[in-house]
Amino acid sequence: MSSKIMEYTKDLSIVISLYNEEESLSELVNWIEQVMIREGYNYEVLMVDDGSTDGSWSLVKKLSEKNSAIRGISFRRNYGKSAALYHGFAAAEGRVVVTMDADLQDSPDEIPEMYRMVVEEGWDIVSGWKKKRFDNKFTKNIPSKLYNATARWITGIKLHDMNCGLKAYRNDVVKNIEVYGEMHRYIPYLAKNAGFGRITEKAVQHQKRKYGVSKFGLERFVNGFLDLISLWFLSRFGKKPMHFFGFTGILMFLTGAVLTMWVIIEKLIQQAQGLLFRPVTDQPLFYLALVAVILGFQLFLAGFICEMVSRNSSERNNYKIREEF
């Protein structure tokens, strides 16, 4: 997303990614509306339907007829939360952009204080921290603590709950980052890499799930760790892959060359001393050296190819939208 100066037509944009949340939508919208009226905000609610197969999208359209602040985007199929946030961020017109989940586990009552922290205290991002959780201890709470500890160590961002869906951003933060793949978990890290380093957190009330079942499982946490490693690598070497592949390749190549020279010199010394010696091709060290040289050359070539790809990649998200209003 490109940076551009814009006039904010709203105080708040609330971006909600939803997938098969028909049961909770009416209650959530009513709750948000009560808070917005009480605080006197000029607001909009951007509901992004990520390919729901229930009646979620039809309900969003009905709710928008009663409340003109509701806007909707519907994908043709399920692309994931990152895709929903990407389009929600692009459409957001509010001075402050708030993200929250549609399952009623995030409380709209937290929004006013988070808004104040962004506007009055000047934070780029205020991230929610579910200090007291109502999730299964073994399948979600413990993996979550392990995941967040690792995320803090790798990213250097001291957040207790990196993956909390309830967050508040300055508008120019979301306009200057690209959320893709499964990187919605690491928006604070994306923002930090884009130059938005004023990041803090606020303890928020976590609600018990009222309808349906959680769509998060142990597999999502494993994927989260893999995504974190990918993001760390891309943030360090994404624009300069030759620095990683080239350096590693040269190191391997030189190691192989040194081992090869050692085998040859050893043979020459034994010859000069009239000692019996095995043919070079009978020595395991020779093949180890050969493998190192070949791997080094291939890694260097991979770095060159990645460098060319990174220089010519458009890095655009391309998702098919069925309907938008």
Model regions: which residues?
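N-proximal low-complexity "stem/linker" segments adjacent to membrane-targeting elements
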Residues: M1-Q34, Y41
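Hydrophobic helical membrane-anchoring modules
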Residues: S2-T9, P188-F325
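Donor nucleotide-sugar binding loop of glycosyltransferases
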Residues: E21-S24, S52, K81, S107, ...
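Residue-level preference for short helical/loop micro-motifs built around acidic side chains
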Residues: E23-E27, D54-S58, A83, D161
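Short beta-strand/loop segment that forms part of the nucleotide-sugar
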Residues: V29, E33, Y41-S52, I73-S74
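A conserved acidic beta->alpha catalytic loop
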Residues: D49-S58, L104-Q105
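Acceptor/aglycone-binding surface of glycosyltransferases and processive sugar-polymer synthases
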Residues: K62, A69-R77, K81-A91, V96, ...
